[in-house]
Amino acid sequence: MNPLQHIEQTYNFQYPKLYHRLWEDGMLDVRWQKERWWEEVFPELKKNPPLLLFRDQFMGLDDPEEIVNLIEDYKSQRGIKAEYLLVPFASECEGDVCFFYHREKPELPPVIVKDWYDFDSAEIIADNLQNFIFYGLLSIVYSIYAKASSLSDFYENIANIYRTHHSYLSEEQAQVIKEIYNRKLTNFPCSANKEENRYSSYLIAKHLSDYTALLSDEEYIDLLNKYNPISTPEDDREFFII
């Protein structure tokens, strides 16, 4: 029994088949616990990037003990309702965690939920893991932190992450990412109105000043609506953890 099967048996939960494939392919192994990770491990991982390596300090969770501890911690410390089964599979910056949500119809693949820790609430951000990967790959080149250590070899990094990720997308999704990743960085003017809510569908943060990216705010939103459509009505996507 591998660690994923142990989690499935413990919580009567079924990971998506694609997640098992990512596990078997070593795409969840970031070796985060090793000392001098940024100096020694990260440069090696960049050559064959694991799952969404360059996204918002994204770190896939591959330690079953850590996963179980997170599930139980969320139940006790965050007061998760009994009807929710949230199985964590990644963490991001500032304590945010991505989960599989075992919803009311367990015969369907679990949806992807992101817990925004500071807001004590979570939101459905993808109907399935494949669409979430598309969303992650798109977001990497939509919001670029100019001082990021990876920017010096930006084009090499995105070429590498496309190479290791495209087989987990649909053919059409992969073609869209390939076309965008072949672009050159462009300076875009700010398009957000001052009175506009900073968060919209997918909790998208529109740029509030001029920005550099491979695609504009408008194209980013259009592509997410087309290739990461969420079946849950917008008013029902966000729910409070406690």
What are these language model-derived features?
Residues 8-11, 118-122, 166:
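Generic alpha-helical structural element
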Residues 145-161:
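Charged, amphipathic alpha-helical linkers/stalks
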Residues 162-196:
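Intrinsically disordered, low-complexity segments enriched in Gly and acidic/Ser/Thr residues
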Residues 1-105, 182, 190-242:
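A surface-exposed partner-binding patch
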Residues 110-148:
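Compact, glycine/acidic-enriched structural inserts
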Residues 32-33, 114, 154-157:
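Short alpha-helical interface elements
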